[in-house]
Amino acid sequence: MQVILLDKVANLGSLGDQVNVKAGYARNFLVPQGKAVPATKKNVEFFEARRAELEAKLADVLAAAEARAEKINALGSVTIASKAGDEGKLFGSIGTRDIADAVTAAGVDVAKSEVRLPNGVLRTTGEHEVDFQVHSEVFAKLTVNVVAE
């Protein structure tokens, strides 16, 4: 099925690309999420008329994401207190929600879906590097200090 992409899609293309995808992928994911429209003659003409507007909108979203990433990088570090044993092992763990709440409390709005923990949840005290994917192309890093209560 031929579709016109309205947004950048990983491993597929970027704004304005006409790509051939399986019908189920287009029907169940791309079209409902607003990432693509079927490549009919009417939609192609409509898209070409709105191309500049859509590109400007994407540029604004990217600029806003870069600004948020700069704010996250400017924070430097965030401290989270949690109950821990004598050897520095936490009772429980610190996950994406806890980190997102701590960063939001520090003054930068972050959704838990933007927090990336490549090594899984934090289970020990100390400093941990945490990645944030604010946009599909924009990443930020932050140090999370986990201290015992």
Curated annotation (Swiss-Prot):
Origin superkingdom: Bacteria
Keyword terms: Ribonucleoprotein, Ribosomal protein, RNA-binding, rRNA-binding
Record InterPro entries: Ribosomal_bL9, Ribosomal_bL9/RNase_H1_N, Ribosomal_bL9_bac/chp, Ribosomal_bL9_C, Ribosomal_bL9_C_sf, Ribosomal_bL9_N, Ribosomal_bL9_N_sf
GO BP: translation
This protein's record includes keyword Oxidoreductase: no
GO molecular-function terms, A-Z: rRNA binding; structural constituent of ribosome
GO cellular component, as recorded: ribonucleoprotein complex; ribosome
Entry keyword annotation includes Ribonucleoprotein: yes
Classification via SUPFAM superfamilies: L9 N-domain-like (SSF55658), Ribosomal protein L9 C-domain (SSF55653)
PROSITE patterns reported in the protein's UniProt record: RIBOSOMAL_L9
Short name of any one Pfam family annotated for the protein: Ribosomal_L9_N
Family of the protein in this entry: Belongs to the bacterial ribosomal protein bL9 family.
NCBIfam families assigned to the protein according to its UniProt record, in alphabetical order: L9
Function of the protein: Binds to the 23S rRNA.
Protein name: Large ribosomal subunit protein bL9
Designated gene of the protein: rplI
